């Protein structure tokens, strides 16, 4: 029997998490943009406790920022006095090109949140990519696990990375646009030294809601039930940006949006994309 690859370790978590009342809607349902805060211990803390955490003070170090996020939430009322039950697992994987050569090392996680009765409230799939902060794309790529992990160099598991092209069309004009430039601010950043991943979701939710309202949709009945996010390159405090969005489906209603950096040349690819799925209240 071949020796087990130590890089194929799976870290599992199971815990209770107190509900933060502002994370609930008027129907006492968990809002989409708050889901990941309840999964942080499962996806980040458990892994860092077992393998080790990055040194955020070392600009030359290896980091694992989120590259893709897939979230779904159920519009079910919960008891805010009873903690959520969180279950999750996280593991290493690699993506390869058509020839089978390694492209990226990643860490993925699959997590669920249930209420005290065991009713599913939310689920998510997260993917972090190993990278270095360097202006040269070739120098940013990490093709071997850091030796300090002590678990080998490359995992066996192969995965596919969600791409921006899966969320937004490239062959037609946006259905929603904004002409005025907006700017990211310091309060939207995190310890990875760039804009926090959930800020893109919150910003796009507001942009899409405004656009749907102008188009005649009834926002008293619609809610954001799911999101897929792809982060192609980071945004930083003080940077300007614009948002655009396209209708992607009708049943259910799906809107895909993109963030365009103000200083990028015309026709440049978006910095990030967010696909939102909407559902109706009963």
What are these regions (language model features)?
Residues 75-164, 231, 235-237, 247-282:
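HotDog/MaoC-like acyl-thioester-processing domains
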Residues 172-275:
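Acidic/His-leaning functional-site neighborhoods
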Residues 68, 108, 226:
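Short coil/loop residues immediately preceding or within conserved phosphate-binding loops
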Residues 1-95, 208, 212, 219-220, ...:
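Hydrophobic, proline/glycine-rich low-complexity stretches
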Residues 1-38, 42-45, 125-143, 148-215:
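Catalytic strand-loop segment that frames the active site of acyl-thioester-processing enzymes
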Residues 8, 62, 100-102, 117, ...:
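Sterically constrained small-residue positions within well-ordered secondary structures
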């Amino acid at each position: 029997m071949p020796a087990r690859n130590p890089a194929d370790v799976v870290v599992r978590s199971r815990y209770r998490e107190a509900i933060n009342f502002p994370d609930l809607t008027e129907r006492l349902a968990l809002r989409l943009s708050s889901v990941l805060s309840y999964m942080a211990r499962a996806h980040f803390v458990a892994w860092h406790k077992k393998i080790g955490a990055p040194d955020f003070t070392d600009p030359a170090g290896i980091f694992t920022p989120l590259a893709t996020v897939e979230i779904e939430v159920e519009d079910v009322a919960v008891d805010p006095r009873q903690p959520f039950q969180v279950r999750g697992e996280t593991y290493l994987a690699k993506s390869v090109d058509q020839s089978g050569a390694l492209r990226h090392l990643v860490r993925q996680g699959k997590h669920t949140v249930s209420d005290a009765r065991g009713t599913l409230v939310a689920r998510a799939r997260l993917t972090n990519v190993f990278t270095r902060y360097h202006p040269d794309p070739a120098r940013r790529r990490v093709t071997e696990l850091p030796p300090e992990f002590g678990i080998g160099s490359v995992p066996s598991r192969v995965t596919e990375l969600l791409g921006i092209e899966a969320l937004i069309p490239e062959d037609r004009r946006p259905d929603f646009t904004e002409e005025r430039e907006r700017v990211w601010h310091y309060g939207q950043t995190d310890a990875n030294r760039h804009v926090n991943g959930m800020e893109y979701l919150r910003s796009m939710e507001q942009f899409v809601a405004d656009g749907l309202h102008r188009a005649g949709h009834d926002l008293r009945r619609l809610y954001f039930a799911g999101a897929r996010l792809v982060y192609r390159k980071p945004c930083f405090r003080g940077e300007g940006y614009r948002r655009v969005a396209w209708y992607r489906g009708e049943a259910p209603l799906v809107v895909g949006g993109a963030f365009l950096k103000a200083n990028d040349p015309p026709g440049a690819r978006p910095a990030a994309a967010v696909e939102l799925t909407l559902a109706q209240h009963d």
